[in-house]
Amino acid sequence: MGKVIGIDLGTTNSCVAVMEGGEAVVITNAEGNRTTPSVVGFSKTGERLAGQVAKRQAVSNPDKTVISIKRHMGTDYKVKIDDKSYSPQEISAMILQKLKADAEAYLGQTVTEAVITVPAYFTDAQRQATKDAGTIAGLDVKRIINEPTAAALAYGLDKQEDQTVLVFDLGGGTFDVSLLELSQGMVEVKATSGNNKLGGDDFDQRLIDYMVAEFKKDQGVDLAKDRVALQRLKEAAEKAKVELSGVSTTNVNLPFITMTGEGPAHLDMNITRAKFEELTADLVEATLGPTRQALADAKLSWNEVNQVILVGGSTRIPAVQEAIKKLSGKEPHKGVNPDEVVALGAAIQGGVLAGEVKDIILVDVTPLSLGIETLGGVFTRIIDRNTTVPTTKSQVFSTAADSQTSVDIHVLQGEREMAAYNKTLGRFQLSGIPPAPRGIPQIEVKFDIDANGIVHVSAKDMATGNEQKVTITASTGLSQEEIEKMKKDAEAHADEDKKRKELIDAKNQADSMVYQTEKTLKDFEGKIPDNEAEPIKKALEELKTAAAGENIELIKEKTEGVTKVLYPIIEKMYQQTGGAAPGPDMGADPGAGGAQGDDNVVDAEYTEVDKDQK
């Protein structure tokens, strides 16, 4: 195996590093810089530009310049340049090709293998898209690792003492926070949280919106409608943000920003740090929720956290540093370069894979729960969030209708009890199931998450061995609203979800009891005296009426009522015929049963596929 480079593919800037002489070093690019702008441009002659050269021509060529493409990874977003459309993977690949070329020039050899980092809160689709971008760029992506984990790896490489660290990673477009334990070469992630739609770009946008509003107030011209002016404002906002980390006031001076009826207009504005903090206060506050969540998930207190490590250029913002300091009660660690530490960690992981680095074990986790939709629209978890990866877990389900020959598997990711509120990762179908009464076929659904955090799902008919496998490739990513729904709504609506799930479980149990009772009455038709059959039929009708309503306690009561009159009769019938009475689990709650483990069978919401429509 040759050199395995480590790449931090960022929203605003990217960085590449490699192991040399047992140490991770950042590779300087062709322009002499240690980081490369994540910008792609297309010149008027059709030439593709990436990095600093693309950023330089952005003002004069805004329509053919692409920035912050990372925010669209894993979605069906397209970039239209002239008469061609580009996917986020293709644009990202152009940035990766630039980094690859810089690494090859530095090393003096061809580079074909890489470790690429992604935000810890990236979904399966976003991780797969990142891996695909690497492939397009001509790289064999040996591993996708989480950015906070990579940062901790770089921080902890030379640390001898055991410690617990919190990595607070606020980059250009994403935010992650992870709790990790470092112990003699072991880097173990305990919990992770974040927001895929929060980063430095959002801070820039607040400044842009403010300058546009102030200019419109003064000059009566809306700069938001001018692409060239907006690009200049974008660069000015980014520069002002950086300057306000070191000074209390900065001046934004953009001559000839636009033309008015009276001639050229100029933008000249002073912005104070206090104004900037006022404009972005809610963005800073938005980082604290996931931080508290990660701490709670790891079951740790701030007293048990030894270090708070700041990663990502946006953590240089004083208000961000002050917020995390106030929350944690600790002075953030300043011993790492927030722009480079992630790439250095990726290079170390590359060294581990290449055999250059010994005695380091990396243990990461999956950020969100994974499961499938089952009867009644319930989200049945198969892998819980913050489970160590790689991992494989399975659960056995059954059919929901008699003679059902195929099942649809609806794969989801999220934290809500109801499937409709979680994120669909994909769907696939298992067909060829031999016709049988419902509840008889046993279908094993297996989830496998590899070391890259990419999900593979299979469904297998235990009787025939017929199996269908799929690597989940969803076409949509998680927006900020969806992320908030998955985490915050899970708590805000916990009671509502719990009651709704309890109602569905009660209805499922009642439905199962109705089905079993009617089947029993049919099987013993003519053998049960009318005076004994009547109470069963009466209780059955009462149960059907209750099950049509929303009263959970009444449904449970009527289900129990059928059990009380039915079981003695069945036992008597079996004694008369010399058979054994059925087990006590007849009509058991299918929803609750499925949560017991791999040996249980639950009714899953599957749809029978008409043969003519296949």
From Swiss-Prot:
PROSITE patterns: HSP70_1, HSP70_2, HSP70_3
Pfam families hit by this protein: HSP70 (PF00012)
Superkingdom of the source species: Bacteria
Region entry Disordered, spans: 576-614
Name of the molecule in the record: Chaperone protein DnaK
Organism taxonomic ancestry: Bacteria, Bacillati, Bacillota, Clostridia, Eubacteriales
InterPro entries noted in UniProt: ATPase_NBD, Chaperone_DnaK, Heat_shock_70_CS, HSP70_C_sf, HSP70_peptide-bd_sf, Hsp_70_fam
Keyword annotations: ATP-binding, Chaperone, Nucleotide-binding, Phosphoprotein, Stress response
Biased composition (Low complexity): 578-589
GO terms of molecular function: ATP binding; ATP-dependent protein folding chaperone; unfolded protein binding
Function: Acts as a chaperone.
Induction remarks: By stress conditions e.g. heat shock.
Similarity comment: family membership: Belongs to the heat shock protein 70 family.
Modified positions (Phosphothreonine) in chain numbering: 174
